[in-house]
Amino acid sequence: MSKTHRIEKDSMGEVRVPADALYGAQTQRAVENFPISGRRFGRRFIEALGRLKEAAAETNVELGLLTPERGAAIAAASREVAEGGWDDHFPLDIYQTGSGTSTNMNANEVIAALANRAATGAAHVHANDHVNYGQSSNDIIPTAIHVSCRAALSGELIPALGHLRDALAEKARDFDGIVKSGRTHLMDATPVRLGQEFGGYARQATLGMGRVERAGEELAEVALGGTATGTGINAHPEFAGRTMARVAATYGIEFREAEDHFEAQGAKDACVSLAGALNTVAASLMKIADDVRWLASGPTSGISEIQLPAVQPGSSIMPGKVNPVMCEALMMVCARVMGNATTVTIGGQRGNFELNVMMPVMADALLESITLLANAATVFADRCIAGITARPERARELLERNPSIATALNARIGYDKATIVAKKAANEGRSVREVVEEMGLIDADELDDALDVRQMTEPGVPGSG
């Protein structure tokens, strides 16, 4: 043994492990086998794994399967891991064994080492025999995925979407009196209110919250208790139920043992469902960010019906240019989340027989998507939406030149004549009002009601009383 390394042994023989590492031989083998991406499991996942190991130790003491001293040492060490004190000792790449066995053993070895610092020799803690008692990587890792994702949804994403919804709803109220051109196919359409557009965006955020909440409910069922293949071999029949009750109390979130362990371990459909919900949220936010970007385009040659807050200089060569950077950042986040949804979908297909074998990458993709969406939604609300101002004069200018206003005349002069008016107005660069007056199609005293653009933004026939 050198000053920098020590020798550890496992079933395959001796391994050189860094002298100051809490982990042992199995983790070191994985370090050497998988130097692939440098991406490690994040805080949420390690916390979940620690909480599960803590609860498992307490349950095993309660069931008489671990001595109180040994169980207390394991629980205390697991708590330290959950609280983030030893994250540097979780070095493994997410691209590893598809069951996550390497990371489970990483946790077992670290927790055993910490527990042995506190326990007496008579209560020596073994990574497999004691820390992992009643568990398999095949049930503890999928359970950690569900716990970490459910916690991230309730603690990060759902509040962030609510914050964005509130910011959008406030703008919907502020802008409700501003009538502007609607647009379909990127072409001028009948009038809408700017507040209606922002109200639609707020509704998208609200529906997105509901979608991820419902998807999160599917994660309440966990695989713990199924052990290796779903049969529950080597686990006390009450182990999973009692353990998950403890975890639920810690997080303040419901968790329960799966109704069918073969589904819970052989398939990851709940994860695929969550990825789909996150993908839908990403599609919604992409649409909102892109609309806001277009509405602010200009300032002289675009739509320019709203103005975004200037948060940084936009160009290294063009003086005074300000770009919609918050929109662009959000759109890139959405692109990443959409890619992650594909990753999770493919991963979900690899549940061969009794075990899914792409769980680490699925866990990473889901947790990354949740955090990215939460952070991006928050900064988009605070640094973009909250500071948007309307340009009602510009909206009025464009609306007056909009030939689709002629739609309001259908009930009075018929579709064919209204089409002639719209084309003439567009071709000659004139307003619909001017063309109608020139053609004498509607009495002058009725024209104001017929072309009341505010009425056009509500159900009914404009000017019909």
Where are these regions (language model features)?
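Conserved, well-structured ligand/cofactor-binding cores
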Residues: 1-465
